[in-house]
Swiss-Prot record:
Positions in coiled-coil regions: 45-145
Assembly notes: Homooligomer.
Chain ranges on the Mitochondrial matrix side, renumbered to this chain: 316-317
Family: Belongs to the SHE9 family.
GO biological process, one term: inner mitochondrial membrane organization
Membrane topology of this protein: Multi-pass membrane protein
Organism: Schizosaccharomyces pombe (strain 972 / ATCC 24843)
Gene: she9
Compartment(s) where it occurs, according to its Swiss-Prot or TrEMBL record: Mitochondrion inner membrane
Assigned GO CC terms: mitochondrial inner membrane; mitochondrion
Annotated protein name in UniProt: Sensitive to high expression protein 9 homolog, mitochondrial
Length: 317
């Protein structure tokens, strides 16, 4: 197993440089393509072309200068060669009376070479003139390329600066609009929602407290009502239900629900509708009457307390 692991590690180590070079090459190619695309979008590709033209013109000027230097060197050599030949001819002419056969042959050869030396000097002079004209033209072309590149760079920088200025103003406008929207629309809605939620929460807590108090009061009243009813039942005469007419309907008093405020109001409405109905005859005992009076008293007090409490909450808001 260790041998397989070591072989796998060695294989990965051998493949890692290839993987790295491949990944690095793809990343560099992607960056280069993205850079070229950005230059095309911003118009910088034309400036890159002018830069390349300037570099080519500099290379051309350098080559022409080398050619001109070589032409001047050949011209100087041709002039020196002709001058040397003329000096030797002059020396031979000065001692013409004592020429030998060798001197005569030398003079003849120098006289013939003088024509070719003159032709070489003229040709070298022409080459120098041509090379200097080429150098001058290349130098003028280089100056024009540099000026054109400088002009295009200035135009491009002005465009970028203008676009940057408009972009900055656009971002500032968006920020101002967002600030106005947030401060004038979103924040008031958020505050209203928070206030509404807080008020609803407080109202629910108040309602729960009122319901708890109503339940406690209802329990106490039920206990007191039962005690009062038992006492009145013991001291009051008994009513015979048989003396009532047979066609009369006896009304059984509905109970009042004190669980919640809404249930209390509903049960009170139902009780009043039954109590004020003309189709029923009410038969009450002293106990029921006392309980009823107690419930009405307590119910009225609870209603008054509730309304006062609600008005107090309204004024606090």
């Amino acid at each position: 197993m260790l041998q397989r692991l070591s072989q796998s590690i060695k294989g990965f180590a051998a493949r890692f440089p290839k993987i790295y070079n491949k990944g690095n090459g793809s990343v560099q190619q992607t960056i280069l393509q993205a850079s070229q695309r950005l230059n095309e979008l911003t118009g910088y590709s034309s400036i890159e072309a002018l830069k390349n033209a300037v570099v080519k013109q500099e290379t051309k000027l350098r080559d022409f200068r080398l050619s001109a230097a070589e032409a001047r060197k050949r011209y100087i050599e041709a002039v020196e060669k002709r001058s040397s030949s003329q000096r030797e001819v002059n020396e031979l002419l000065q001692r013409r009376s004592s020429w030998s056969t060798i001197d005569l042959e030398r003079f003849t050869k120098l006289y013939r070479d003088d024509y070719s030396n003159k032709e070489e000097e003229i040709k070298a002079q022409e080459d120098v003139d041509v090379a200097e004209r080429r150098v001058e033209e290349a130098q003028n072309g280089l100056v024009r390329s540099i000026l054109s590149r400088y002009h295009e760079e200035q135009v491009w920088s002005d465009k970028i600066r203008q676009a940057s200025t408009w972009g900055t103003w656009g971002l500032m406008g968006i920020n101002v609009v967002l600030f106005v929207v947030v401060q004038l629309i979103l924040e008031p809605r958020k505050r209203k929602r928070l206030v509404r939620e807080a008020v609803d929460h407080i109202d629910k807590e108040r309602e729960l407290e009122i319901n708890d108090e109503l339940k406690k009061i209802s329990e106490k009243l039920d206990k007191k009502g039962e005690a009062v009813g038992q006492a009145l039942e013991l001291t009051s005469p008994k009513i015979d239900n048989k003396n009532l007419p047979k066609n009369s309907a006896s009304l059984i008093l509905p109970p009042i629900n004190y669980d919640t405020f809404h249930s209390f109001l509903d049960s009170l409405k139902y009780f009043l509708s039954r109590f004020l109905s003309t189709d029923y005859r009410i038969q009450l005992t002293y106990r029921q009457l006392s309980i009823l009076a107690t419930k009405f008293t307590v119910g009225g007090g609870v209603i008054i307390y509730t309304f006062i409490h609600l008005f107090g909450l309204a004024f606090k808001r």
